[in-house]
Regions:
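Active-site neighborhood of divalent metal-dependent phosphoester bond hydrolases
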Residues: 66-121
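N-terminal active-site segment of His-dependent metallophosphoesterases
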Residues: 1-76
């Protein structure tokens, strides 16, 4: 189900997607959060859990900032989704700061202070 908030100003528009997840649809369900650009540790974890296409990887946000490898994380997610892996990534407060920082100077300073400075290096 998609809910559009079209009554907001253009720069405030949001889309809410509500999706029912039935755990019986997957062999295993893995839930991760706050990876913060640590692709090096994430790779080790994925190897250890031996993620399969029949599994679900649910990421509760905050993949970016603080660690040096935010781009690599999002790139990995995209590649695995293209290979038909079941990956759902929710927007965390760090993703929100990143997007808000594009058009809002106050958010930009807050984002940089909270680890965005490492992301853009």
């Amino acid at each position: 189900m998609k809910i559009n908030f079209n009554n907001l100003e253009d720069d405030e528009k949001m889309e809410l997607i509500i999706r029912k997840i039935k755990e019986d649809d997957y062999q295993k369900v893995f839930v991760l959060t706050d990876i913060h650009g640590r692709f090096d540790l994430f790779e080790k974890l994925i190897e250890k859990i031996d993620l399969k296409k029949e599994d679900l990887l649910l990421i509760l946000g905050d993949s970016c900032d603080r660690g040096k490898f935010s781009f690599e994380l999002y790139n990995w997610y995209e590649e695995m989704i293209q290979k038909d892996y079941n990956i759902i990534h929710l927007m965390g407060n760090h993703e929100n700061m990143l997007f808000e920082s594009i058009s809002d100077e106050n958010f930009r300073l807050n984002w940089l202070y909270n680890g965005g400075n490492v992301t853009i290096k």
